[in-house]
Amino acid sequence: MKKTFLILLCLSMLLVACGGSAVETVEEPAATEEVETLDAPATTVAETLDKIVFGFVPSAEQAQLLDNIQPMMDLLSDGLGIEVEGFVTSDYSGLLVAMGSGQADVGAFATLGYVTAMNAFPTRFEAIAKSVRYGSGSYHGTWWTTDASICKSTPVIGAFENINGVPTLVTGSTTASPDVAALQVGWGFGDDGLIPEVRDGVTTSPGLACEADISVVTGEEVLFVEEGSTSGYLYPALQLKNMGIDYVNGITPRFAGSHDGVIAGLYNGDAKFGVTYDDARRTLRKTNADVGEKVIAFAITDEIPNDVIAVRTDLPEDMKQKIYDILAEYIATDEGLAIMDEIYGWTDLVPAVNSEFDVVREAAEEFGLYDD
């Protein structure tokens, strides 16, 4: 495609070289060449490094994010026995360059950001943890339509879930949310679980879904998020390719620029097909309570691994394990859960499995993100 990632990477490297860096300039950790000494007795963290730098990408105002992560940095410092400094980059390419150049030791990456980082610096990165959101370690893209005539049967209150690898329509009712991982439009949290959502006296319509063949988009205008969106373009476009549908010439692709932009475009009649994460209809519910019945789910993509925490591969193994243990224990506390849910929507951490990212790598290769 347009080599978007490589352009960002080059710009980020140029900024770092010129001193106008997209990340805070931090002192490179000393003596990293002594990290792996097979014949030496196990070293303590304090003997190996004097500081760990943990990078984040903004999900809110930078100052607020720094305030939110400070308690976690303090816990890591206490547990590791050395200073842990948190810093915020301007974007994922900035975090990639910071870790690839040794300016940062740990980073919180989105899935595609981690995969492209691994390709750019194949020996520098290692994912130690994957985030969990409300019990799920993955998510998917959802295909939407405003044309109920494409449905094989009348749309119902429900949502799609990949069950044993098979996209399955899970139904709900006016009083019971469909039992799926993603929080669906029309539902909110009550004392006893999910309840119908009422805002300012207006009931938000529960989301409708139906089964339809993805091939119905052939020859049609389709709203995508942006070319770098995993759930909002890469996975669904790869899905079309694998079905024998040209995702450039077999449809008319349009890019709304954001997930809520896709939903708004569908709601306003700009197109009758689109794709976002599940359930992006919630972004429009405050102003358009009927979005769940006007924008209908009809298919989903394969599962996409959640965000990861990656570390430099040359960190000591005992340090990697301690970092994981401290973070996993932190998010299991009320304070840690509240902070991580606010920052990234994380509710738990599990060990990362490298093979889970193979489909993301396939998509990155298909769309030229690895081109020279």
Predicted segments, located by residue:
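Extracytoplasmic small-molecule ligand-binding "clamshell" domains
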Residues: 45-113
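Short helix-initiation/N-cap motifs at beta->coil->alpha
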Residues: 86-97, 210, 215, 246-264, ...
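Short beta-strand->loop
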Residues: 125-135, 250-252, 285-303
